[in-house]
Swiss-Prot record:
Topological domains annotated Extracellular: 36-46, 105-123, 145-173, 223-247
InterPro entries recorded: TLC-dom, TLCD
Membrane topology: Multi-pass membrane protein
Record-annotated membrane-spanning stretches: 47-67, 84-104, 174-194, 202-222
Primary site of residence: membrane
Keyword list, A-Z: Cell membrane, Membrane, Signal, Transmembrane, Transmembrane helix
Gene from which the chain derives: TLCD1
Intramembrane region coordinates: 124-144
Protein name: TLC domain-containing protein 1
Amino acid sequence: MPRLLHPALPLLLGATLTFRALRRALCRLPLPVHVRADPLRTWRWHNLLVSFAHSIVSGIWALLCVWQTPDMLVEIETAWSLSGYLLVCFSAGYFIHDTVDIVASGQTRASWEYLVHHVMAMGAFFSGIFWSSFVGGGVLTLLVEVSNIFLTIRMMMKISNAQDHLLYRVNKYVNLVMYFLFRLAPQAYLTHFFLRYVNQRTLGTFLLGILLMLDVMIIIYFSRLLRSDFCPEHVPKKQHKDKFLTE
């Protein structure tokens, strides 16, 4: 009798429901004064809390996977470990949850960049989940979550109007370093690796297309980060006021 369900589907469902339950639990926490008075900021705050939790867990998990299976740094297509596979399923579940959360909360227009990113990320992760290829690439991609820890702290402090706090000023420099080490560097390394699939009709070619689009998004985000934190006089005060990604 043919198997009707892929064994990864329960893992994806379980991860998605875990993040849903986590969001409900985090919604019980007290809110900063500047957040609780604004429904949009309240939603952003809760959304970022879940993102923060995901970044901490998956960022540390990705580092452990690379440490346990260093072949993932070289054999990006074929290297595999159970821990790495579960990590990719875990993060795919987060992206499914966050996509549903954004759409269900009516933030699709304000958060369209996040939705595009999530769709591309899920497309890449599903190749590792359902075809057991490029699991190593998925783990290396998730090193970005180490950078996201500090990026999320930055966004949460901006939402709560704490830009003048010492922690914000320290974090903006740490965030810049982490952006280079765990976002730009891994992305450049992966792009260089996947360029070998140019002119081929393979799964690697599909993933190269996703990587190139993510490259563009990462460069745009980096320019926004520099402009907002280091050249604030060049940021129009009312520009993108309602965007989920605060600059």
